[in-house]
Amino acid sequence: MNATDAESRKPENKPSSESSSSGSTSGSSDGEVSSKTYFKNNKSKVLSGQREVVLEVVRDLSYTICKEAEEKLVERFPRKDGSNEMLPKEDSINTNHNYTTDSDEHPVELTTKTEECKNTEKTKKKSFVRALSKDKQLSAYRSRSRSTRLSYSGHISRTHSVEKSLSRYKKSVLRNRRTSFGHGRDSSTTKRSVSRDKDNRLRRRIGSSRSHTRSHSRFRRSEKKLPSRSPRRIRSQERRHERRRSMSSDYERIALRRSEPIKRRDKDEFFKNNKKVSGDIKKGKGNDNGTVAELEAKITERQRKSLDILTSRTGGACLTPDKLRMIQAEITDKSSAAYQSIAREALKKYIHGYINKVNVDSVAVITRKLLKDNIVRGRGVLCHSIIQAQATSPKFTHVYAAMVAIINSKFPNIGELLLKRLVIQFKRAFGCNDKTVCLTSSHFIAHLVNQRVAHEILALEILTLLIESPTDDNVEVAITFLKECGMKLTEVSSDRVGGIFELLKNILHQGKLDKRVQYMIKVLFQVRRDGFKDHQSIIESLELVEEYAQFTHLLLLEDVTYPKDILNEFKFDDQYETNEEKYKALSKNILGSHASDSDGSFGSGSNSETALSDCDKGKNEVNDKYTSGDIIDETKPNLIALRRTIYLTLNSCLDYEECAQKLMKMQLKTCQQNEFCQILLDCCAEQRTYEKFYGLLTHRICKMNKSFIEPFKEIFKDICQTTHCLDTNRLRNISKFFAHLLFTDAISWDVLDCIKLTEDEAITSRCIFIKSFFQELVEYMGLYHFNKKLKTEVLAGTLAGLFPKDNPRNIRFSINFFTSIGLGGITNELCQLLKIAPKSAPSSSSSSSLSSELSAPSDDDSSSDSENKKKHKGKNKKMTKKKNPSKKKEETKKIVGKNKIAAKNKTIKRRTDKDNSSSKDNFLKSESSSNESISLDSLSSELFAPSSYSSSESSNDSESKEKHKGKNKKMTKKKNPSNKREKTKKKLSKNKKAPNKNTKKRMTEKDISSSESSISESKSLNCSASNQNENEKRKKRVTSKSRTKRVKMFKQCQWVDADNQRDIKRKKRAEYRYEPLVYRKRNEEYLKKGGPNCRKDNYGNRQNHEISQRHDSEIKRRREERKKRHHEKNHSREYKRSKLGPCQREYFLYMCCQFYYPCTFQCLCQNCHFTFYS
C-alpha cells in the first residue's frame, strides 16, 4: 500500500480514536462497576475478536515490508504495565499498515474493540495495584511475563518457519523487558528516537490503545515460509542472547537474595568475583599450564581429567594408591596451574590434620610443624579450619588461642585475619539472634584477649554492646565472656570492668530477666569475689609467648567489615617457585636451620655440634688456603666491616626493639656470635655512665636466639679473671650490664661460681666489680627478694666462693666485706655458722681449724696481759713510795730487787691456770645458751674482735678493771688524812668485800704476795662470783645519784699511760657489746629489790621501805610513768658515753634491727620500723 493512501486516511481515523478515548474515559469515570461486569460477560468475545484481527493482519503481510523493517531502527511504544520497550521498526510499520487496511474493511469493529481493550486493561491495572504490595511487585511482574509467554506459545504451532523466527524475536523482547527493570536504558535516552510531530503522537496513541493486539500479531504471521537467515547472523544473535541471559540471571539473583541468609549471599559474591578464574580452570579455557614465558601452553585432556579427580571433593580417595601416584607424577611443572592446585589441596589436608591433633601438650610441636608448610599462602584455609574446629569443640578454645598466639608472634597478618573473621562472625550472629554462634565466637575472642593477640578495648566494646540491650540471651553471652577474660580485664582496666559489673547489678535489681539468668549474674559476682581462681586467664603450660614478643591488634567493631573470603580459594601464582623459596628461608630463620621436630622451643637456633662442625670446616678451609699458596689477608677486613655495621645500627636506632630486629636480620654465623657479643659489651663499657639500652637489647637478643647465651657466659667468666686490666668506669658499666642480664634471667645464675671472695685472692678491682654488681642487683630486686634468691637450693653450690664455709678466716672476710658495702643482711647464715662452729666435734677438719684459730690468740692475750700487769705493779709501787719516808723507800727497793724473779714466775703460773679455767667456763656457758637462742654479746664479741684476741679476753678485762680502781684509790689517798685508814677498815668489814691491796700505806713484800695469791685463788675458784661483782659495780655506777663523782673517776682514768688507755678502750667495747642484755638484767634485779621504793641507810645500803598504798588507778599510772622515766634516763646516760667507729656502728645497728633492741643512733637500713631513743 502506498504512503499517500496512508496519509489520506490519517485524518479519517482521528475522530474515531478521539471518540474511543473519550468514551473510555467517560466510561471509566462514570461507572467502573459497569465496565467490570461488561468485561466479565464479554471476556471470551473480546479474546476471540482479537485473535481474528491478528490473523487477518498477519496473512496480508508481505515479505518485502518485513525485509525492510528488519533493517531499520527500533521504535519506542508503550507497554501495558506502563514501562517502555524497544522493538524493531518493522512491527510499527506493519501495525500502521494493518491499521489502514483494516480501517477500510472494518472501521467500526476496530474502534469498539480498542475501547473494550482499554476498559479491560484499566480495570486490570486498578485491581492489580490494590492487590499487590510494593515488596512483591517484582515477583508479580515475573509471573505476568510467564503467563504471557505461555499464552503466546499456544499460537505458534501453526507454521514452523514463522515459529522459529518469531520465537527468537519474542525471547529477545522478553529479556529486554526483564533487563529494563533495573538495567535497561534510561528513559531520557530512548526519548530521542520519538518524533514530536502531531502525526507521530496520534500514531503513538493508537499504538498504545492496540498494544495488546499488536503483541499478538507478532506471533501469528502468515503461513508463508520466510527465507532462512545467514548462519553468521544467527551465530551473532545466539551470542547476544547468551550474553543477555547471563546478565539477567545475575540481576535476578541479586534481587532474589535480599531476603536470603547471609552465608548464601557471601557465596554468591565470591562466585561473581572469582567466576572467571574458577570457570576457566574447570572448563579448561584458561591458560592452566601457562608460565610467565609460555602463556599459550595448555593442559592436555588427560591432565584435565586427572586434575578434576584430584581437586574434587573426595580428593582422589576413590583411586588406588598406585594410580594416584601415577596421576601426580604426570604433573611435574611447578609453574603450572595444575601443580599449584594439587599442592594447595595437599596443604589444606595437612592443615586440617594438624589442627585436629592439637592438645595442651602438643601445641608447641604442632605449631612448629605448621610453620614448616607455607601458611602464608594458605592463611585463609588455616583461619577457616581453626574457627571451624573451635566451633565444634569449644572446650579446647584455650588451646587454639595459644596456637594462634604463637603464629601471631611470627606472622601478625594471620592473627589479624582470624580476629577480623571472628568479629564479623560475632556481628552477624548478633544481628540474626544466633545465640550459639555468639557464644563460640565471643569465647574465642576472650581467649585471644587473654593471650594478648586482641586488645582489651575490643572486649569492652563487646560487653557494652551486649549489656546495652539486656535480654536473656545477651546477658548470658556477656556473663560467659566475662568469666573467660575477667581476670585479664581487671588487671588492665579495673575501673571499666567495675562499671560493667555495676550495670549487671542494676539489671539484677530490676528483675526483668529470667530467674536462670539472674542466678548466673549472682554466680558471676561470686567468681569475682574469689578472684577468678577457677577461670584463669592463661594456664602455665600454655603461656608459650612472652609479652615483649607478642603483637597486639587494636580492632574496633565498626572498623571490621571485610572478611577476605577470597583467600580460601585457589589463585594462580606466576612466581610460585620464588615465593616458596622465600618462605623456606623465612621458616629456617624462625625454626632454626638444624632444628628437630621434637623441639618445643621457637627460635632456638642450631645445635652446638653443628656449630662446632661449621667452625672446624672454616679452619680446614683456612689450612687448605695456606697449603695451596694463596694470599690471605690477616687484617681481617670482614671483621672490621662487621664491627662497623653493628656500631652503626646501634647508634642509628631509636628503640632497642628496632635495633634487635635489625641485628637479627644480619644472619650471623656461629663463629661470629662471640665477636658480636664482645662488640655489644665494648659499646656499653665505653659510655660515661651505664645505659639501660644495652641491657634491654641483649636481653631481647638472648630471648630471640638462645645461641647467644653461652658467649655472654664465657665473657663474664673472662672479665672476672681480668678485672685488673680495666679501669673503674668500665668495671662499673660492665658489672651493671651483667647485673641486668641476671635480673632478667637472660643468662643463668650459674655464672657466679667463678667468683671467689677470700682474703688471699681479694684485689681492689675485683672488689669494685663485685660491689657494684651486687648493689645493682639489690636495686633491681630489693634486699628481701635478693636474699631469698640466694638461699635457693639451686644456687647453693654456685655461691660457695662468695660465701665460704670452710675457714673462719674466710667467713669473717666475707662478712666484713658485705657489711662494709651495706649488704650485711645477706650474711646471716655465715654469722650463725661462725657462732655455732666451735660446737662441732673435734674430729672434723673444719672444727679443728676453727678451734685452733680461736684458741691460738688466747695464749697471746694471756702473755700480753701478764706483761701489762707487771707494768701496773711497778707503777703502783712508785706511787706508794712517794707517800713513805726516804728510809723505807730504800728498804722496799732492796726487797723488790731480791724477789723480783720469783714473783714474776708465780704470777705467770697463776695467770695461765686462771685463763684455762675461765675459758672452760665460758665454753660451757656458750653451749648452754646456744640451745635456746643466739646471744648478741657473744656474736658481737666474735665478729668485732680481731684475730689476735680471743674469748678469754672478758676475764682479763675484769681483772684490769679492779686494777684501775685500785690506782684511782691511790690517787685519792694523797689528799685524804691518816685518819681515813680506820674508815676504810670499817667499810670493808661491813660490806664483806675482799681486802684491797692498797689499804695500808706501808706494806711489806710478804703482805703483797699473800694478798695477790688470795685474790688469784678466789678468782680461779669462783669465776661466777667475779661476774656478779662486775654486774653489781655496773649497777651501782648507773643507780648512783651523784653524777659528778663518776665523771671525775672517768677523767682520772684518762690520764694514765698509753698501755692503760688501750685497756680502757677495750673495756669500753666489751661494755658496749654487753649493754642491751646487761640493762635488761639490771632493771629486772632493780625491780625485784623494790625499785623506786627502795631506800638507803646512812652507810649506803639499800632497805626495802614498805608504804601503805591504795589500789587506785591513778597511783598505778603514776608509778608506771615514774618507771618509764627512770628507765629512759638510765638508757640515755649510758648510751651517750659509747663511741664507735663507722663499721662497728653499722654492724651494731644491723644487729639491733635483727634482735629488736633499741639504739641511740639513727638506723640506716630502710627495713627497720622500730622507734629508737635519742
Curated annotation (Swiss-Prot):
Biased composition (Low complexity): 16-35, 138-153, 597-608, 840-857, 926-957, 1010-1020
Keywords associated with the record: Differentiation, mRNA processing, mRNA splicing, Nucleus, Sexual differentiation
Biased composition regions of type Basic and acidic residues, renumbered to the chain: 1-15, 79-92, 183-200, 235-259, 910-924, 1089-1118
Origin superkingdom: Eukaryota
Record-linked InterPro entries: ARM-type_fold (IPR016024), CWC22_splicing_factor (IPR050781), Initiation_fac_eIF4g_MI (IPR003891), MIF4G-like_typ-3 (IPR003890)
One Gene Ontology molecular-function label: RNA binding
Location of the protein in the cell: Nucleus speckle
Pfam families attached to this UniProt entry: MA3
Domain MIF4G intervals: 348-531
Feature: compositional bias, Polar residues: 36-47
UniProt main location, coarse: nucleus
Ranges where the MI domain occurs: 641-757
Bias type Basic residues, positions: 167-180, 201-223, 869-886, 895-909, 963-1001, 1034-1045, 1119-1130
PROSITE patterns, per the entry: MI (PS51366)
Nucleus is among the record's keywords: yes
GO CC, alphabetical: catalytic step 2 spliceosome; nuclear speck
Span list, region Disordered: 1-51, 79-109, 136-259, 597-616, 840-1045, 1089-1135
Further information: The M.domestica genome only codes for one male determiner Mdmd protein, which is encoded in the M region, and can be located at different loci on the genome (chromosomes II, III, V or Y). The M region contains a cluster of tandemly repeated Mdmd copies with only one intact copy: other copies are degenerate with large truncations and frameshifts and are assumed to be non-functional. The presence of multiple copies in the M region may preserve its integrity in a hostile non-recombining environment. This protein is encoded on chromosome Y.
Family, per entry: Belongs to the CWC22 family.
Quaternary structure (record): Component of the spliceosome C complex.
Protein name (Swiss-Prot/TrEMBL): Male determiner protein Mdmd(Y)
